[in-house]
Amino acid sequence: MKILFDSSILVPALVPAHPRHELCYPYLKAAKEQQTTAYVSTHSLAEVYSVITRLPVKPRPTPTQAQTLLTDLLTYVVAVSLEKADYTNAIDQMASLNLPGSGIFDALIAQAALKAEVNCLLTLNPDDFTRLAPELASLTNTP
């Protein structure tokens, strides 16, 4: 199975002190053990770094620890880069649905899922994706 991980899964999976770690970690572990083929949007890499270095948990990962976590992640997760056309598609999609603001970042992650032709977009925030397109609704899953 090909799974694209949303940052809402990666953050708790990577940080043992996160309250949802036990829920999310098994999916990342399966990817690390090559039981699934895992993908991440390159946008999500920056988002994960930003979030885990500001998490209100103890111990909070330092920037160096966050870098190490992401470097390790990229040894077993495929990063999906977007091109100009992918960004244009995401913007067009948002405009056609009359959706403002930060939802564009979900649209970019959705574009990465479609580009990688995954079977599953794994997220803790399914409504952020199911509202974008019918084909995403069928791909979007929660743990």
Residue ranges and their predicted role:
Residues 78-124:
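Active-site neighborhoods of divalent-metal-dependent phosphate/nucleic-acid chemistry enzymes
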Residues 30-34, 54-58, 72-79, 96:
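General structural signal for alpha-helix termini and helix-helix connectors
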Residues 1-40, 55-65, 131:
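Short, well-structured N-terminal submotif of metal-dependent ribonuclease cores
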Residues 62, 71-87, 98, 129-143:
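Short acidic, glycine/proline-enriched helix-loop-strand junctions
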Residues 39-42, 123:
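Short beta-strand segments at enzyme active-site cores
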Residues 8-9, 43, 108, 127:
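Alpha-helix/helix-capping structural signal
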